[in-house]
Structures are given as structure tokens and as C-alpha cells.
């Protein structure tokens, strides 16, 4: 059971200096993505790639960050580069990956922050449910496209590259617990069917797919080359609730006023997973700053079967789009 009041979170430890490092932040033009970029700059990072759907908005964010007195004084020479990445479209993901590989020699940190939570069933150009496309499919493709490049970055720096994926403990609310798969039913086809769309559980469904894919992928990756983990920052005071109906938004805004963490604190949790958590976090899910125990659903026979199917079906999907590296095959 989730406690109403969230535990207090301490800031990052002193002494973190990211000079010489490069980070990619998806969804960097607002909310936690914007604050992630700000805090990385405050930690003296040399280069941040702002991966955004709206390039003009991204450029305005760069101007805003350049105007920050602290950043201007202490890290004014940092490189901030805006690149287009629309997670709703596979071809945008592939263009972004090529652009990144062609222009940026080394990436040390890939922070997968972009995400949505829609309450209506809508489809992406791929034909998939839009929430699943943005939160899951496109992230899986992005990782597959970049994994050899991230491994090469680690070989050049002799330090593991980090992939940190923003998840949510909402995965525990998955609709699959109430509407289990039929014996021969495919998970991804099930999720795409309108009759199985559960508005208040779809976000959790998408985060379950992310978590299960990450856990399976981590088994294939050498953590001496790439460390991948996932975290839940808890309830954070962002604008994600703006998609709710007015009557629900009013209630949630009251709850957020009492319970939600400031965006700054939510980002401490993300950066803890990306910068502080050790190799033991590889393939793990972190709640706040701690590695969580495996959920009852995931460890159950039904959950294990779903995980196996998700991996196989996702590989089948991705193989139609790109040449997969050995780890994703």
C-alpha cells in the first residue's frame, strides 16, 4: 500500500563534478526534463542534448537556462544542443538516433524522461495505442538503436555508460491483473485493442511494459559497459494532471498541494539513479533512492509469462524497423 505522505528526500551528495561528460535528456523542454537539464548544468556537465518534440520550445528553454545567473557564472561554457525527438513516431526516433551518433562522439548518460498519460484511446501513426507508443515502444526502439553506440562510448571512456529510465510504481495497477491474457493471446495486441483500454490504468500498463523490457534487457548487457536502471520519483508537482477532466483535476491538485514533491526533489531521485546508484542497480527498479523488491505480480507465474511474451513480441516488432544489436535479439 502506498503511504499518503512521501518520505523526505535528501539532496545529491556533495562532490559530483560532471565536467567532460555528455548527457541526453528526453522530454527536456518542460517539467522534470527541464529541471534535469538545469541540475546537470549545476553539476558542471559539459554537454547536454535536449531531445524535444518541439524544437522552437527547446531553443527557448536553452535561452532560459543561459539566462540563469548561477549557470551563467559557473558553467557558462557548457554546450546545449537541441535535437528533435517525437516519441509518437518511430521514424523520428530513428532520425534522432542517427543525428546523435553522427554528431556527438560520446554519450555518458541517457536519461529517458519523456512520457505521457492519456485518458482516451488514441492511436499513433504506427497504429499502436499512443500512450504505449510514447512511453514504451519508442523508448525500446531508441535503446536498440543506441546500444552499440553507448557501449562504444564506455569502451572509449573505460567507464560504464548509464541508461536511466523514468518509470512509475503505477505499474502495480496494471489492467492485466483484472483482465488476464488468454492462454494464446499476445500481450501487445491485447494492449492495442480498444475494448481493453482502461483509462486510469493505461499509464500503469505502459510502465509495466517498460519495466519488464528493462529487466529482460539488463540480463543481456554487461554492466561493465552499460548500466541500465529504472526509477519512480513518486508524486511530483508537474503538469501531467492537466490531461484529467476538470472535476478530477481539482481533486488531484488538492492532493498534489499536500503530498507532491517539488520538481527539484523529483529530479534528485532521477539523478541519484543516473549518477549515484552503483552497479547493483543494473536491471533494478528504484523507489525514491532505494532498490525495490520485486513485485508480487511480476514474480508470479502470470507476470513471468507476460515478461517472456513482451520480450519476444517487442523484439519481433523492432526487428521490422532496424537491425538489432546482439543484446536485443
Curated annotation (Swiss-Prot):
Database matches in Pfam families: adh_short (PF00106)
UniProt keyword annotations, A-Z: NADP, Oxidoreductase
Residues at which NADP(+) binds: 57, 86, 113, 203, 207
Residue spans crossing the bilayer: none
Keyword Oxidoreductase: yes
Coiled-coil stretches: none
GO function terms (MF aspect): oxidoreductase activity
Pathway linked to the protein: Secondary metabolite biosynthesis
Assigned EC number: 1.1.1.-
Active site residues per record: 203 (proton acceptor), 207 (lowers pka of active site tyr)
Iron-sulfur in keyword set: no
Family under the similarity heading: Belongs to the short-chain dehydrogenases/reductases (SDR) family.
Protein function: Short-chain dehydrogenase/reductase; part of the gene cluster that mediates the biosynthesis of the tropolone class of fungal maleic anhydrides. The pathway begins with the synthesis of 3-methylorcinaldehyde by the non-reducing polyketide synthase (PKS) tropA. 3-methylorcinaldehyde is the substrate for the FAD-dependent monooxygenase tropB to yield a dearomatized hydroxycyclohexadione. The 2-oxoglutarate-dependent dioxygenase tropC then performs the oxidative ring expansion to provide the first tropolone metabolite stipitaldehyde.
The name this protein goes by in its record: Short-chain dehydrogenase/reductase tropG
